Amino acid sequence: MLSRGSSTRVKLLASALVLAALCTSATTARAQDNEAPRVHQGFWIGGGLGYGSVSSSCDGCGSSDSECGFSGLLRLGGTLSEQVLLGVESDGWYKDINGTTNTVGNLSAAVYVYPSKTMGMFLKGGAGVAGYQAKNGSDKLDGYGVGLIGGLGYDIPIGGHTAFTPMATLTWGNLGDLSFNGQSSASGAKQTLLQVVFTFSAY
């Protein structure tokens, strides 16, 4: 599983979360009085990059400290109503640790709910598949299992049907048994990813 990281990196991620929340609050306050109703219809797509913190555990190996690295998100789907969108979301994380490439990901069926027609804030949740892989040369440790996601975001309009959309997402995966070069390795593996991603969306 992942090696132990420094608490400084976790503090940096916490600072990014606070900054994203403050920016969202400020945008909401400015827009509440004069923002026009938002229109969601048909096909939509969005994606972007950011930063994330991963923690993991398994039976007999305990829990690791968080590791921070580059993170990304891609989502697409259709419109159920002006305030409810359905889609598929892929959340990923990557870091090279001492020559070993570590990747974490979730692929989920997701729902996005806008509590208000005139505000860009939305909540999201979904379920699907989670995966982990660590690779160094020909050696590979990997595992796959059930995954869940949850989070929130805010659409800041930049055009008729486009928006700048910062998002905070928490993903969880129950990977079960890990495999090392095809042979059973650690059991009871679980992982979480907390990410802040800055995306562009087209509705």
Predicted regions and their residues:
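Intrinsically disordered, low-complexity regions
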Residues: L19, S138, L175-D177
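Cleavable N-terminal export/targeting peptides
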Residues: M1-V39
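Short, aromatic- and cysteine-enriched interfacial helices/patches
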Residues: L2-R4, C61-G62, I156-I158, W172
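Gram-negative (and chloroplast) outer-membrane scaffold detector with strong preference
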Residues: Q32-N34, Y51-S55, F70-A168, W172, ...
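A generic structural signal for short, solvent-exposed coil/turn residues
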Residues: L17, C23, P37-V39, G78, ...
